[in-house]
From Swiss-Prot:
One of its GO terms (biological process) is methylation. It comes from Bradyrhizobium sp. (strain BTAi1 / ATCC BAA-1182). One of its GO terms (cellular component) is cytoplasm. The lineage of its organism: Bacteria, Pseudomonadati, Pseudomonadota, Alphaproteobacteria, Hyphomicrobiales. Pfam families: PCMT. It is found in: Cytoplasm. It is an enzyme of class 2 (transferase). Belongs to the methyltransferase superfamily. L-isoaspartyl/D-aspartyl protein methyltransferase family. Its EC number is 2.1.1.77. This is Protein-L-isoaspartate O-methyltransferase. The gene is pcm.
Length: 215
């Protein structure tokens, strides 16, 4: 980090390291992507606080540590194709875009999808495609993915989503009740077998099937 970095950004990086984030590529990317571009204007001064924040459509931008942790758990490589379910502000997609080949991110709210697309284009994240759609029902032509990240809580991970994983692919998702504590789960595909590992407790907004009729 440059010695002239604002104190809040220096504390931001220190917090991530203290909480166990060690992947240098992830840390560098978290430093480079300006979180203030993804929060509401009234929250820009608090953009580097390690907490989730409200955005439009009753959704949230995730806590920076959780973004970094989930990204680290994906074990991304530069040639990977990544699917994100739940674009939200676009912040997670911006982080992913710097660590893989391309990202397809799916959002059910048109307002969020349009704003995220604008932000990502502004930051030259041209390897990200923002799709207005239903993360539970991807079109057949969407194809397979090396990594899948879900940023809203599911009661269970649908097999149709697991089947989108390439061999040796990894999926990470919060699983549990819609209103309460969920468990972050990492699933690794080996052939037709799926190994599941529970990681940490988290709180996410619920994943809802379908495309929002309003907003």
């Amino acid at each position: 980090m440059p010695p002239t970095a604002p104190p809040e950004k220096m504390m931001f990086q220190l917090t991530l390291r203290r909480r166990g984030i060690s992947d240098q590529a992830v840390l560098r990317t978290m430093e480079e992507v300006p979180r203030e571009e993804f929060v509401l204007p009234a929250d820009r001064a608090e953009a580097y606080r390690d907490s989730a924040m409200a955005i439009a459509c009753g959704q949230t931008i995730s806590q920076p540590f959780v973004v970094a942790y989930m990204t680290e758990q994906l074990k991304l490589q530069k040639n990977h194709r990544v699917l994100e379910i739940g674009t939200g502000s676009g912040y997670q997609a911006a982080i992913l875009s710097r660590l893989c080949a391309n990202v397809l991110t799916v959002e059910r709210f048109r307002t969020l999808a349009d704003k995220a697309r604008e932000r990502l284009e502004k930051l030259n994240c041209f390897n990200v495609e923002v799709m207005l759609g239903d993360g539970y029902a991807l079109p057949p032509g969407a194809g397979q993915f090396d990594r899948i990240i879900v940023t809203a809580a599911m009661d269970q991970i649908p097999q149709s989503l697991l089947d989108r994983l390439e061999p040796d692919g990894i999926l990470i998702a919060p699983v549990g009740p819609q209103h309460g504590v969920q468990t972050l789960v990492r699933v690794t595909r080996t052939g037709d077998h799926f190994d599941r590992k529970e990681l940490v407790d988290v709180r996410f907004v619920p994943a809802i099937p379908g495309i929002a009729r309003e907003l």
